[in-house]
Amino acid sequence: MKDKNINSTSFSISKASKAINSYLQLFPEQQWNEVIKITLLFGIDCIQEHFALSTPRIDQLRNIIIHPESSPLDSILTKTPLKNNIINNNQNFNNKINHQHNHNFKYQQDENNNTDDEQEQEQEQQQKQNEIINKITTPIKTPSPPPPPQTSQTSQTSSTSFSIKSNNKTNNNNNNNNNNNNNNNNPFSTITPIHKNHQNSISTSSSKQLRSSLKNTPSKFAFFTSSTSSENNNNNNKNINNGNNNNNNDGGDINRNDSSSNNNNNTHNSTLFIDDDDGDNNDEINDENDINSNNLTFSSSTKSKKINNNNNSIDSNNTNINNNNNNYNNSINKLSGRESKVEFNEDRNQYSIYSRGDTSSSNNSDLIFENNNNNNSSIYNESATQVEIFYDKNGQPINHLYQEFQFQQHQNGDQNNNSQFLDESMLKSNNSSNNNNNNKNNNNNNNNNNNNNNNNNNNSSSNRNSSINNGNNQSSLFYNSASTNQNNNNNNITTSLNYKVISSPLKNLNLNPTTTNEQISKSVNFDRNQNQKSPFLNNTSMPNINFNEQSQQQSQNQYYQQQQQQQQQQSNNSMNQSINYKDINPSFLSSTPLEFNDTVDTSGSSLKYSTSSNNSKGFSNISNNSKKIFDKSNFNLGSMGNSSFGMSNFNSTSFGASTGGASHLTHTFHNNGNSDGDDDQSNNSNSLFYTPRSTHIMNSMNSNFNHHHNNNNQLFNNSGSNKQMGFPIPPNAVPIHNHTHHHYHNGKGNNTDQELEIIDLEDQPTRFNNKNNNNSNGFTSNKRFYNQH
């Protein structure tokens, strides 16, 4: 032979087959199995040395040789998803061999013309190998048959259980024995399903993973909404999953048979997956493209987590509120802008949600809504809508985002300063409900990329809420909750406040009277009780969803599947449009729909703003000291409410420009004829919540929340029939910067101050200094929140 090296490419499969057949002819047929086994075992040490194989691998090879009937190959091919891969690999290997045969064809022809000397050399070497084997084992003493001619080119088959054919494989010791009795040594064993009553827990390090994974989050993201449902399931937890498990082609859920008691709390958990819009025609949140593109949504842990995305200037803040006195525990899960806060007044069951835009961009959006519970038991059973505008890392508005903020029962938030948003029992409710022993809890969960689709309802003995937190470097701008409760009280109330969030750019809203219809043609209309339409969603109607009906879930999926073609990024060009948010009408706000409209009269020295609702009155006359305040600021100012708000009582001088320039808008809430004598309007340094984008230096602002002299005209009002006032913050308002102090002075005819101090520092609490505990219209002293960055 030309090359005796085993590594030579000339040593082909056909040649090896020929050598093996010739080798076996030296032994009786009865000994062939034993000869093959001994030969393979003898060569393992050489193989280990030659290929530097690990000991476990060598042990596995020995086990296969000794017990070929337990080889995992057949099990792998029939029981795991790797079947196609193995077959393809075999096919590729065969193709490679065929290709190799073509290269060896010439040499094989030469081989057929080998001289007698070369054949004798081969026979001598085979004889030496046989002598070595004879030293290891004692063959059965039976007369050996005469050796066949060496020129035979075909394999000799036999009736025994072992035979060799070129490029062929047969099982020995029962052909049909494909059992894998060695699963522990099978690296390709199938995934073990989650056992009954077993729940996977996610480590607290997930928050760090999520925080770090958000650094390069694309502006495109998945989103979906849900609604709560009520069921009495007789102490059963139901984990319902609409498929979407990558490793289960049957659309099932790994833990779909799981059922466990929940301390008399009946929780119905539904998982809804919709179009993730990642361009791969796969409507699963957890598909591979999502994993590779960091485009997955994630469910937050009930521990409050601050997830900071420096590139996109987006924070996801999870707020947990708990009041143990009446087992009414709520949580706010919200996706916010740069800064967010939630204010509560326990004495009056009141809360305010306030979110700011991006401090690093001029495209800021600020909005604030306050709520006055007023002991209305139906308040938290209705949906309320807050409008927020979010921006991507390029400063462009994120053009579509719906989200539901769910108020659900939770325990207190995490006390870790690195993740805490609210750390005290914030909300007290006197609501009554007949929903005894009935928890309504809807979880929107996404499975992780480890083939586990978990509705993780891990109710621990510590009464601490637990939920799935899909880490694994999954990230998204969408933020939703997944939670359950554990309380031993049979009168737990879990209701939800659904926040539908729609973004819309108001960056360059043209307030010129010559604005054309085309410039303001796009509008956003909300109707809480009917279909909801948005130009950013191609005016596609979104059906109302009832999670008690599977058909409604399907319609929700169908709705989102229609959104694959929608525009993902707004143009950098200026967009001029009006925004009308109609028929939102949350019960705790007023009986009048809230409407934002850009009907602004810029003529003369007075700027007028009004809303179209018959009962809703806006700022009828805004004085700007002969300067047009809105000319440079380019923002839309609105109000909500009806005549009971007292907003129509604001006099014409309530809104004046500061002496430092028209770009510093002063807000002084003042009721005509009810002043206690303080000249609030002359204090041009006062500014409520914000200052428009301008040359005004934010660090020099020491804003005042202004005196409210009449109890019926309080910013946070709870007297008589007056409803809570909500104040929209202009989108171009510059969020308050570091060390800015706000003082909320609440007087009852004697100018008694109650100070609200906001210290805008990372992970530092804001102190509510209560100077008048007897003032029912003011803040109480136990309120703390963080101004998130």
UniProtKB/Swiss-Prot annotation:
Residue ranges with Polar residues bias: 523-549
Chain intervals with Acidic residues compositional bias: 113-123, 274-290
Region (Disordered): 107-326, 426-491, 523-625, 666-751, 765-789
Protein name per its UniProtKB record: Uncharacterized protein DDB_G0286591
Bias (Low complexity) ranges: 124-141, 151-194, 201-213, 225-270, 291-326, 429-491, 550-581, 602-617, 696-722, 766-789
